[in-house]
Amino acid sequence: MRSIFKTSLIACATVIAASSAFAQKAGDNIVSMGVASINTDTDVGPLTNSGQFTPLLVGSTANISSETTVSFGWLHMYTDNIGAEFTLGLPPTVTQDLTTPNGGALGTSHPAAAKIELWTPTAVAKYFFGTSKDQWRPYVGLGASHVSFHNIKAKQTADVQALAGTSAALSSTWAPVYNAGLIYNIDDKWSINGSVSYIPLTTKATFVGDAAHGTTTTTGDIKLKTTDYVIRLGYRF
């Protein structure tokens, strides 16, 4: 009986020791995969048109759809508390609605006026609180994202084609990333990472349309304030 009890104590001690040897320590690399929910608030600045549409575009607003996509991450720990993570998601296609309250002949409501493919590769430096033996590791991060817009397709309606039927472009830009999150270490290999990021940016919009009186170009700044919610399953090696 004493031998069995002693063996049980040793087994328990081994389990406890193993469970305390979690992750996020100097030299660790953690790859992860999960989902990201992308939510964007849009602020359209004054739009200028080379033709007769400028007065019709005063007060224009836009709304970009929220989308969910697959997210990948690679985290490298330089110390037990400092790491850097590179993330990239499968580029989601977002839908942009446009409202022109003074649109007149253009109309005032243009749902699904354009579809846009969004790329946001991101690098973030992170500070992890606690120690490498903690099962829960909250963190804060600061980084940058290169945001670019591809395969922009304008809706095939007369009003939208008059504004952007020939071409539509949004300039690529670098944007700051403010990040906070929490890692739960399942064991010394597997973990769950949940985070939220805020990415504010300004992009230059250039739309070329084919109106009845000829080709016109519309330009203006669009401010995007994006909040990303991410959860991923990670593996340390």
Map each language-model feature to its residues.
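Short sequence motifs at beta-strands and strand-loop junctions characteristic
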Residues: A62-T68, K115-T120, A168-A175, D221-K225
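Predominantly the C-terminal beta-signal and adjacent terminal strand-loop region
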Residues: T93, I186-F237
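Outer-membrane beta-barrel translocator domains and adjoining extracellular loop/strand segments
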Residues: D43-G51, Q96-A105, H150-A162, A205-H213
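Gram-negative (and chloroplast) outer-membrane scaffold detector with strong preference
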Residues: Q24-D28, N39, F72-Q156, L224-F237
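Cleavable N-terminal export/targeting peptides
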Residues: M1-G27
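Extracellular loop and loop/strand-boundary signature of outer-membrane beta-barrel proteins
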Residues: L56-S60, L106-A114, Q161-A168, T215-D221
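A charged, solvent-exposed segment within the mature domains of Sec-exported extracytoplasmic proteins
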Residues: F129-N193
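Short glycine/proline- and aromatic-enriched beta-strand/turn motifs that initiate or cap beta-hairpins
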Residues: F22-G73, D228, G234-R236
